[in-house]
UniProtKB/Swiss-Prot annotation:
Any one GO molecular function term: structural constituent of ribosome
SUBUNIT field: Part of the 50S ribosomal subunit.
Biological role stated in the UniProt entry: One of the primary rRNA binding proteins, this protein initially binds near the 5'-end of the 23S rRNA. It is important during the early stages of 50S assembly. It makes multiple contacts with different domains of the 23S rRNA in the assembled 50S subunit and ribosome.
Name of the protein this chain belongs to: Large ribosomal subunit protein uL4
GO cellular component: ribonucleoprotein complex; ribosome
Source organism of this protein record: Porphyromonas gingivalis (strain ATCC BAA-308 / W83)
Gene: rplD
Length: 209
């Protein structure tokens, strides 16, 4: 698959870049995507939720009312789950939500997500760019020129670039990621994908089947 390369002014440079068909042109596997996104979101959970159960509360164990003769139900002590401020029955406990997936399945999910983007014409390739100093206005101008600023956009960079990162971090709907860290969730969470020429080379090399 070939895509045109644009400059930061949004103009077609006349150059073409090749996207590996084993990454960007496969038949997407929806179930693999589902599992990978489910794992990503599960791994983000802290799992620190906790509610005290009856044995963990401090308070008097004296019975509030006598066992029989009141005509009502037995109440027990002040920590009873039946009462406001009492214990929780089967309350949440701290737990680890993360789970493992096979590397091959995760790779298939990532290629499926990228193939969906390519199929829907939501991938743009630009020339490599840099800033001498952090310039949010300059980065915003690039998004405007490429017509991707109104919806969520993910810029894929070949390497860490502090000035580019600082220029983009305050822009709404704009995220940056390194080419070697692309994952299924991040790709699908954005409407458009903007790759630099060197990013394409990294993706083609690392993720080809």
């Amino acid at each position: 698959m070939e895509l045109s390369v644009y400059n930061i002014k949004g103009e077609d440079t006349g150059k073409k870049v090749v996207l590996d068909d084993s990454i960007f042109a496969i038949e997407p596997n929806d179930h693999a995507i589902y599992l990978d996104v489910k794992q990503y979101m599960a791994n983000q959970r802290q799992g620190t939720h906790k509610a005290k159960e009856r044995s963990e509360l401090s308070g008097s164990t004296r019975k509030l009312i006598r066992q029989k003769g009141s005509g009502g139900a037995r109440r027990g002590d002040i920590n009873s789950p039946l009462l406001s401020g009492g214990a929780r029955v089967f309350g949440p406990r701290p737990r680890n939500y993360s789970f493992k997936l096979n590397k091959k399945l995760k790779a298939l999910a990532r290629r499926s997500a990228l193939s969906y983007k390519a199929k829907n014409n939501e991938i743009i390739v630009v020339e490599d760019f840099n800033f001498d100093a952090p310039k949010t206005k300059a980065f915003k101008a690039i998004s405007a020129a490429l017509k991707v600023g109104e919806k969520k956009v993910l810029y894929v960079l070949p390497e860490v670039n502090k000035n580019v990162y600082l220029s983009a971090r305050n822009l709404p709907n704009t995220n940056l990621i390194l080419a070697n860290l692309i994952n299924t969730y991040t790709v699908l969470a954005s409407k458009n994908l903007v790759l630099t020429e060197r990013s394409v080379a990294v993706v083609n090399e690392l993720f080809k089947a």
